[in-house]
Design a protein with these regions (language model features):
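Short pre-catalytic strand/loop immediately N-terminal to key active-site residues, enriched for Gly-Thr
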Residues: 112, 163-168, 220-225
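Rossmann-like NAD(P)(H) cofactor-binding subdomain of soluble oxidoreductases
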Residues: 37, 46-47, 55-60, 64-67, ...
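Internal alpha-helical scaffold of NAD(P)-dependent oxidoreductase catalytic cores
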Residues: 106-111, 127-165, 178-214, 256
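Small-residue helix-packing motif on alpha-helices
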Residues: 30, 40, 58, 74, ...
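NAD(P)+-binding Rossmann beta1-loop-alpha1 motif at the extreme N-terminus of oxidoreductases
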Residues: 1-53, 57-61, 126, 189-190
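NAD(P)-dependent Rossmann-like dehydrogenase/reductase catalytic/cofactor-binding core
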Residues: 203-258
Length: 258
């Protein structure tokens, strides 16, 4: 099995790191290309994979080709690679918002896997949602499951529309959480906590709370209620958030992303 990455940014590196560290594939079985030669040189040196300057050369002997470019660049890539894929090759797309049907038309190719990981893939904590076309090789389906497992948890869905929904929740989700963390740190500073202490308290509180949620059998609502004493400080804070339609605005944000 040989695979190629067209686009060698952070998500490509996360996948390459997971694949090589888990020994899912050998470094010599992995090719990469990018318009920025510095990126492929970096990946070549760090992971001992093969670097190419030409996309056609990179995909020539690959079984699976990962498209890891920005969605707005897909039309340019299709001009170069349309009709260049063989029947025994599978395109793997990580492009947000780009439908399988669109990819089939752009590349005139039917064997396609669409995946949507998220940035915690960089630390092997991704949640990846994926699906595939009916004409995808069963061997490639099995391989992508192993690859996604190497960077975290994977969830197969039959309906492609669920990937777009998941993109709004789990793929964009880290950004929402980081904004919340930023806000908590800023609030801590605002009430007088030293900068470093506010940052440490916030990040460790988030870490502990997520671990509690994962290990507890209680629902998020029940865990929240456990912290909230009637007439206490937590209730005072939550009242402000509720009056500001905190939950409704989160739902509104997810719908905007979808």
């Amino acid at each position: 099995m040989k695979i190629s990455f067209i686009g060698s940014g952070k998500m490509a590196e996360a996948l390459i790191s997971g694949i090589t560290e888990s020994h899912t594939l050998s470094p010599n079985s992995i090719n990469c290309t990018d318009r920025d030669d510095n990126k492929t040189t970096y990946l070549n040196k760090k992971y001992k994979i093969n670097k190419y300057t030409n996309n056609l050369d990179a995909i020539k002997n690959a079984n699976m080709i990962f498209i890891c470019i920005k969605p707005q660049d897909i039309n340019i890539l299709s001009y170069e690679l349309k009709d260049q894929f063989k029947d025994n090759q599978t395109i793997v797309s990580i492009l947000a918002g780009t439908q399988i049907q669109t990819l089939q038309k752009l590349f005139n190719h039917d064997s396609i896997i669409r995946i949507m990981p998220n940035t915690p893939a960089q630390i092997k904590k991704s949640v990846s949602v994926w699906t595939h076309t009916k004409k995808t090789d069963p061997i490639h389906i099995k391989q992508i499951k192993s690859i996604l497992t190497s960077i975290g948890n994977e969830f197969y869905v039959e309906k492609e529309e669920l990937i777009d929904m998941a993109t709004a929740l789990s793929a964009s989700g880290p950004a929402y959480l980081f904004l919340f963390v930023e806000s908590l740190i800023e609030a801590g500073k605002n009430i007088g906590l030293p900068d470093n202490l506010s940052e440490d308290l916030t990040t460790q509180m988030i870490d502990g709370s997520i671990n509690l949620l994962n290990f507890s059998e209680e629902s998020p609502q029940k865990l929240r209620e456990n912290v909230t004493s009637p007439g206490g400080t937590t209730e005072a804070a939550l009242t402000v958030l509720i009056k500001a339609n905190f939950k409704a605005n989160i739902i509104k944000a997810i719908k905007a992303a979808y």
